Amino acid sequence: MLRSTLSSWREYLTPVSHKSTFLSSGQITPDEFVQAGDYLCHMFPTWEWNKAGNDVLFRNFLPEDKQFLVMRKVPCNVRAKQFVNIDDSASEAFVQGINDEDGSIENGWMIGGGETDHLSKHSLSSGDVTPSGNNTKTMDETTPDIDDLMESMGIEDTDDIIDTPQNTDRRYYDLYITYSTSYKVPKMYIVGFNGSGSPLTPEEMFEDIAPDYRSKTATIEKLPFYKNTISSVSIHPCKHANVMRILLDKVLVVKRRRREEMSENHNEHKPNPESDEWEDLQNDVDDTIRADQYLIIFLKFITSVTPGIEHDYTMEGW
């Protein structure tokens, strides 16, 4: 509880910045968080913003009806420890890829080998998802292929999940995403219920956190955006920005390489100089992850922390 109290004070005391440093730091501003939340709700309508009710504690740097995102009653049929083990060498490759400059190992979104084996996880693939409305692009056209990037970073994503039991261990989770002022990134909270709708204890909720993360990134906390006391397990965001920054760099390299290959294959005619200048500018934009796509990628990594929670249970194409 001491860690939870310190975290709450840190959130309260940290000043809010509205200067965007997303491309250089991997952090986002409150305005970018709102944009990312709108994009998530548009792409996946099972996510929604909070209602501006009397039970909500408002923070003045966010709109009253956009304090946090929520998806309710998400199924969870198996405990985290029941997932199939995969090769620890994959996790080692990823850890080595996100070392601090001083040589220390970062622990956010980390897939560590350690004493416990790494777990397989659900995949939220970024392709083949079409938002509602006309004249829109698919996720595969608007976002980088995160599965390819994760593979290049040495992270394995398997579908070798054990068979789902016949609802004897069925649970449900309400998932919340809010903005962390101290880390300037999204922060996830989960609140669990058993099959009959009774709240889970914190100890029971920890059963659905991957063992490698229970002591590193998961904390028992009161939901900070409700006036009533509701116990939850939070996923600590201490290194999210660093991992996002690494992804940004990798996206830049991968997409530029692909563009160069396409240019070589289709070098039949050259555009005029004015077109060249505009194309270079457009390519620079296309070579990056946009800030409003942050939460799509964020949820991709959260599945490694909560492998049994079916984040994609109504989201065809994830």
Swiss-Prot record:
Domain of life: Eukaryota
Keyword Chaperone: no
Region called Handle region, residue ranges: 242-293
Cellular compartment(s): Cytoplasm
Composition bias, Polar residues: 122-137
GO biological process: autophagosome assembly; autophagy of mitochondrion; cytoplasm to vacuole targeting by the Cvt pathway; glycophagy; piecemeal microautophagy of the nucleus; protein targeting to membrane
Record region (Disordered): 122-142, 260-279
Disulphides: none
Active-site residues from the entry: C238
A Pfam family matched in the record: Autophagy_act_C
One GO CC term, this protein: cytosol
Stretches for region Flexible region: 83-164
Keywords: Autophagy, Cytoplasm, Protein transport, Transport, Ubl conjugation pathway
Annotated InterPro entries: Atg3/Atg10 (IPR007135)
Listed Basic and acidic residues bias regions: 260-273
Function: E2 conjugating enzyme required for the cytoplasm to vacuole transport (Cvt) and autophagy. Required for selective autophagic degradation of the nucleus (nucleophagy) as well as for mitophagy which contributes to regulate mitochondrial quantity and quality by eliminating the mitochondria to a basal level to fulfill cellular energy requirements and preventing excess ROS production. Responsible for the E2-like covalent binding of phosphatidylethanolamine to the C-terminal Gly of ATG8.
UniProt subunit comment: Monomer. Interacts with ATG8 through an intermediate thioester bond through the C-terminal Gly of ATG8. Also interacts with the 40 amino acid C-terminal region of the E1-like ATG7 enzyme. Also interacts with the ATG12-ATG5 conjugate.
Family statement: Belongs to the ATG3 family.
Domain-related comment: The N-terminal region is involved in phosphatidylethanolamine-binding and is required for ATG8-PE conjugation. The flexible region (FR) is required for ATG7-binding.
Protein name: Autophagy-related protein 3
Organism for this UniProt entry: Vanderwaltozyma polyspora (strain ATCC 22028 / DSM 70294 / BCRC 21397 / CBS 2163 / NBRC 10782 / NRRL Y-8283 / UCD 57-17) (Kluyveromyces polysporus)
Gene (UniProt): ATG3
